[in-house]
């Protein structure tokens, strides 16, 4: 294949951003890894850009994954607004203190509950769950080892990992726990 260097470049991008997502000790590093994995996924699905199906698959994958970003980004912003930090250990320490922070948008929402639900939306979008799975079968248009890598090791587990990483925050709002268990 004459495109092996490009393939290795895209694969290197993916393998650079996944450890960044996993080893990040703050929300910004997690978000950069999250976005990088999404970009690498798009590039790898779109690897054979001359094929119409690969083009359609990549074009479908990108907006569906952006849904997850529209949950994660406000969730991170909300955590920063509420806790004045992006560091996970500090957020978890401050979350244990009783908080009566409410957001009023024609209804009263507990701030931590809203943040957790936004994080869940991010995880659902990235992990191809509950309606956001439409791009996943089409991702097989990418090169075979990449298709397996994107599904098993990165995209699906990224959302699950983020929920697990933020689980100390999810302990406090009972409404968010109910939403997660029913999702």
From Swiss-Prot:
It catalyses: a ubiquinone + NADH + 5 H(+)(in) = a ubiquinol + NAD(+) + 4 H(+)(out). The keyword Electron transport applies. It is a multi-pass membrane protein. One of its GO terms (cellular component) is plastid. It is an enzyme of class 7 (translocase). Keywords: Electron transport, Membrane, Mitochondrion, Mitochondrion inner membrane, NAD, Respiratory chain, Translocase, Transmembrane, Transmembrane helix, Transport, Ubiquinone. Its main location: mitochondrion. It holds the Pfam family Proton_antipo_M. The chain crosses the membrane at residues 7-27, 30-50, 111-131, 144-164. It is found in: Mitochondrion inner membrane. GO terms for biological process: ATP synthesis coupled electron transport; electron transport coupled proton transport. It comes from the Eukaryota. Its EC number is 7.1.1.2. Core subunit of the mitochondrial membrane respiratory chain NADH dehydrogenase (Complex I) that is believed to belong to the minimal assembly required for catalysis. Complex I functions in the transfer of electrons from NADH to the respiratory chain. The immediate electron acceptor for the enzyme is believed to be ubiquinone. Belongs to the complex I subunit 5 family. This is NADH-ubiquinone oxidoreductase chain 5.
């Amino acid at each position: 294949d004459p495109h092996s260097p490009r393939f290795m470049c895209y694969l290197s991008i993916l393998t650079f951003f996944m450890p960044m997502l996993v080893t990040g000790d703050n929300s910004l590093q997690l978000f950069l890894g999250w976005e990088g994995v999404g970009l690498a996924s798009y590039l790898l699905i779109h690897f054979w850009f001359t094929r119409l199906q690969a083009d359609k698959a990549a074009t479908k994958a990108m907006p569906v994954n952006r849904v997850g970003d529209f949950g994660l980004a406000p969730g991170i912003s909300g955590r920063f607004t509420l806790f004045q930090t992006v560091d996970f250990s500090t957020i978890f320490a401050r979350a244990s203190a009783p908080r009566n922070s409410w957001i009023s948008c024609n209804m009263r929402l507990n701030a931590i509950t809203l943040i957790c639900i936004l994080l869940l939306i991010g995880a659902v979008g990235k992990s191809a769950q509950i309606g956001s799975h439409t791009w996943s079968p089409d991702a097989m248009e990418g090169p075979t080892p990449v298709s397996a890598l994107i599904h098993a090791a990165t995209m699906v587990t990224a959302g699950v990992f983020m929920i697990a990483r933020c689980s100390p925050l999810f302990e406090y709002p009972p409404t968010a726990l109910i939403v997660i268990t029913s999702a």
